[in-house]
Amino acid sequence: MADLEEQLSDEEKVRIAAKFIIHAPPGEFNEVFNDVRLLLNNDNLLREGAAHAFAQYNLDQFTPVKIEGYEDQVLITEHGDVGNGKFLDPKNRICFKFDHLRKEATDPRPYEAENAIESWRTSVETALRAYVKEHYPNGVCTVYGKKIDGQQTIIACIESHQFQAKNFWNGRWRSEWKFTITPSTTQVVGILKIQVHYYEDGNVQLVSHKDIQDSLTVSNEVQTAKEFIKIVEAAENEYQTAISENYQTMSDTTFKALRRQLPVTRTKIDWNKILSYKIGKEMQNA
């Protein structure tokens, strides 16, 4: 073990540490970070070499953050990254600094929005917030309006989590939806992600995702937003139902097949007659 440690360069150690951090289960970033910190035993090397991993984790996980002085949380995503460690809150038209290690937002400042698409963005956001409030008690959503390859594009992100460390499980839902504002019809592209970690009597993770494509009729802002939410709701309901049904199937068939219902003798022990069995006599004599 000592020989292996001597063979690893600082660069290799940081690369391994960064992988652990990026793949930390939802709600367990601090635990993984502290374990990696002990293993590496070099805080400066960890902070400097693995800083990109802290950022990547928050971007991948759609980490929600509360900005002081503002009511609603905003998601940390690649779509809101405006550079230099700053992120966009499109609803409040501000940008802010974000500390990826402490997960804190500071220094909020006004930020000019894409005026040409803002009315579309606002309509979608209003409809999406109502949907999230109804379906995700702990949900947070952020809607962006951007010009991508010359096309006005709406990007909607949803995050909802339950962290139950006392009960040995944590889980997070993420979904991302995109469509361009084009006459008549457009294509909606979505990706749905679920990640759950259970670790009381073992170490089990569910990591699942599903890609979605559908067509959307584009009319005015409000009506288009309503039709968009119908697509989101149908797809997310179907996905969650399928996950639940698969788990029920595994519980009824797959997991039961992993163990015998009866011992090798194909006979259940009658505990009331245990003393008449040879093992009972041996236990009594012991």
Swiss-Prot record:
Q: Which GO terms describe its molecular function?
A: actin filament binding
Keywords in UniProt for this one? Answer: Acetylation, Actin capping, Actin-binding, Phosphoprotein
Residues modified as Phosphoserine are S9
GO BP annotations listed: actin cytoskeleton organization; barbed-end actin filament capping
The GO cellular component terms are: cortical cytoskeleton; F-actin capping protein complex
Family in the record:
Belongs to the F-actin-capping protein alpha subunit family.
Function (record text): F-actin-capping proteins bind in a Ca(2+)-independent manner to the fast growing ends of actin filaments (barbed end) thereby blocking the exchange of subunits at these ends. Unlike other capping proteins (such as gelsolin and severin), these proteins do not sever actin filaments.
Quaternary state and partners of this protein?
Component of the F-actin capping complex, composed of a heterodimer of an alpha and a beta subunit. Component of the WASH complex, composed of F-actin-capping protein subunit alpha (CAPZA1, CAPZA2 or CAPZA3), F-actin-capping protein subunit beta (CAPZB), WASHC1, WASHC2, WASHC3, WASHC4 and WASHC5. Interacts with RCSD1/CAPZIP. Directly interacts with CRACD; this interaction decreases binding to actin.
Q: What protein name is recorded for this chain?
A: F-actin-capping protein subunit alpha-2
